Amino acid sequence: MKYNQYAYVETDFQQQVKELIDINFLPKNYQVWDFSSLLAKLVKNAIAEAKTDAAKNAKLAEFAVSDHQTLADFLKEKPTEIGTEQFYNVALQLLGYHVHYDYDFADPTGFMQRNALPFVQDISDNQKLISAFYRLLNTRAKNGQILLDVMAGKGYFTQFWGQNKFKFFNGKSIPVFDTNKVIREVVYVETDLDTDHDGKSDLIQVTVFRPEETNKGLKVPALYTASPYFGGIIANEKRNHNVDENLSDSTEWNDPQYVHSPIVKAEKPDGSSRPATEEAVHKSSYPLNEYMLARGFASVFAGAIGTRGSDGVRITGAPEETESAAAVIEWLHGDRVAYTDRTRTVQTTADWCNGNIGMTGRSYLGTLQIAIATTGVKGLKTVVSEAAISSWYDYYREHGLVIAPEACQGEDLDLLAETCQSNLWDAGSYLKIKPEYDKMQKQLREKEDRNTGQYSDFWEARNYRHHADGIKCSWISVHGLNDWNVKPKNVYKIWQLVKKMPMKHHLFLHQGPHYNMNNFVSIDFTDFMNLWFVHELLGIENNAYNQWPTVMIQDNLQADKWHEEPDWSNDLGQEKIYYPTDEGELFQDGNGKAQKSFTDVGGIEFKKAGISESDWQYKFICGDEKWAKPSLRFETDEFIHPTTIVGRPEVKVRVSASLPKGEISVALVELGERQRLTATPKFLMRGGQELGYRFGTDTLQEFVPDKKTKAKLITKAHMNLQNFKDMKKPEAIDADKFYDLDFLLQPTYYTIPSGSKLALIIYSTDQGMTKRPLEDETYTIDLANTEIKFYEK
């Protein structure tokens, strides 16, 4: 598998020497060293676990330059150069590879080439040896980290603890901070909100992890993760809304309105500051933050209103949530007051912070990054938003229908608010908050409007895209192309806005579902984040803006292949339109004339079968007779050449329904029995990545070829028939009358290999996402007025 590397910054020899000397890897008087002695010195320096020269010398005998000579014996000969194969036999061992198991003595560079590991051809003098080692220290080891990080995990950089300053290598911050002395403290930031209606502004509990060196005058940036889950979650799956019910008449919609909570202005900072008096008991919960904390970046967590330690009630997705989370950045930047405890008597400032804040986090944590970025809050320099919601309507609804996130049937805004209302866990807080919490829950249940599923002012207040013009910070989005929790159109739609803005922006699309990608084999994402944060938050010019293409997309056939694109949109491809035929085929010159029908039975058979939603989906897309019966399927011939679908497919369907209401679902599926990638990354080295020195670990993982399957969902979408004219305004429809639907599927970037077919499936009830009616309904499709349009690359 290829260990692709994008974050390595090309560096001239003089800079290499300067950096190597700065980390005590290269002797300052290297010019007077002979080749053999210098080679021995550099190898021994890389053996960071051995702490004495005697121990390092003993270790040399454990390395071999060939199938007949150890490194120790080779060095005894006082060589004046080293062959490329000899050097990289040793290098691969330093990188954690095992001869005979991973590679052969006879061809180390061939192995490196196959795995995208860099090497140099000529190591015939001291200068070339030094450059070869500089590159080796920046080469990804078997565990996915660069060798320098592997050495850090063995204690190499403890020699620099207490020096009270950052150090950089190849444009990245290195772990020279004593992680045994991390300051772990809690403060209380005062907001301008009163969501619990007690007449006082809500306090937000903020947990800070910062280097001890900041108590000695060092100012550092902060990585802030706004996590409503940080204080704990209240399990409530058993109270999910019932989805086994008939569809309602959407014309009953009454456009529920959003109303902001009372505003109570916070005190202004008075210039005084005392140290925090409460110690953090929660642990940092995000590996990327931990990794950067060891490298000098403070890690800050806050759950915002309604979470444990904070005042207020949860109002999922509302402006109040955004404002309370943004207040933390205002405090970090010096613009808002915080107190040492809940008595509000002693102020404390973030005088350890340099005023530059970046944000991290996935899912809800990524969502709040988008929300906060749209406020343009001062101090926020960059966001790294993973698997984030850009409109809550697009999370819980679609085209006039109630649509569940994957594996969350029956969940909605009110239940997510309950999940995160962790301040109810404290008995005193429960007594105070519970009455106001109950009122808010009632309001959320009413206004989220599960009866009609329609867009409203309530949902408009939760659409961050409509405030995108407020974004001032640089932008990185990360999303899984197979994320059916936070569906891809959330990132696609915000990307279409961000890409037109002047600030620097990047997009990473991987093959996962609702997943992080910082520990993948196929891409050095963590190294890029290090480079990025150093540039954005420390102001170091390190070429971060030029290291990566604007858009990086992981291939769905080969996990270690990444496509470099200028954009992610329909413009990447050529428009193609396919039409269904009466015989169930799908052609560009299809000429179907028939009207074909299917009868949807809602969730009746699904409930009887007792299978999971994911099992149902696989059987359904494969064409299992029992589950495919309530649908129409149209298939292309086998593709002769690989074809990549990019952007957002669009479907037009002329349909009539036997009832004056209905829901239509459409899926695009790749058909063909073949080996596909695992649905989730496989753990390849559990706990194999050290985040610092004895400071937590992460697990190397990657998608790998899995057992053969018959089909793979590419994309899908759903629509309410009563929105045939307007996605934001329902109209009454008549039974047995044809209506034209025109709607977009989730965006994709998917390669159909030669030998596979493309299938268009038209159906109604999606057991994992839509409501599951209790009554039968027959749908008739007019094939002459039905088509699927997409863009081929």
From Swiss-Prot:
Pfam families per UniProt: Peptidase_S15, PepX_C, PepX_N
Keywords linked to the UniProt accession: Aminopeptidase, Cytoplasm, Hydrolase, Protease, Serine protease
InterPro entries according to UniProt: AB_hydrolase_fold, Galactose-bd-like_sf, Pept_S15_Xpro, PepX_N_dom, PepX_N_dom_sf, Xaa-Pro-like_dom, Xaa-Pro_dipept_C, Xaa-Pro_dipeptidyl-ppase/CocE
E.C. designation(s): 3.4.14.11
Subunit structure, interactors included: Homodimer.
Gene Ontology MF: a single term: dipeptidyl-peptidase activity
Keyword Ion transport: no
Cell compartments where the protein resides: Cytoplasm
HAMAP family, alphabetized: Aminopeptidase_S15 (MF_00698)
Annotated family: Belongs to the peptidase S15 family.
Broad EC category: hydrolase
Protein name: Xaa-Pro dipeptidyl-peptidase
GO terms for cellular component: cytoplasm
Top-rank taxon: Bacteria
Lineage: Bacteria, Bacillati, Bacillota, Bacilli, Lactobacillales
Cited Gene3D superfamilies: 1.10.246.70, alpha/beta hydrolase, Galactose-binding domain-like
GO biological process annotation, one example: proteolysis
Native species: Lactobacillus helveticus (strain DPC 4571)
Role: Removes N-terminal dipeptides sequentially from polypeptides having unsubstituted N-termini provided that the penultimate residue is proline.
Active site residues per record: S363 (charge relay system), D483 (charge relay system), H514 (charge relay system)
Catalytic activity reported: Hydrolyzes Xaa-Pro-|- bonds to release unblocked, N-terminal dipeptides from substrates including Ala-Pro-|-p-nitroanilide and (sequentially) Tyr-Pro-|-Phe-Pro-|-Gly-Pro-|-Ile
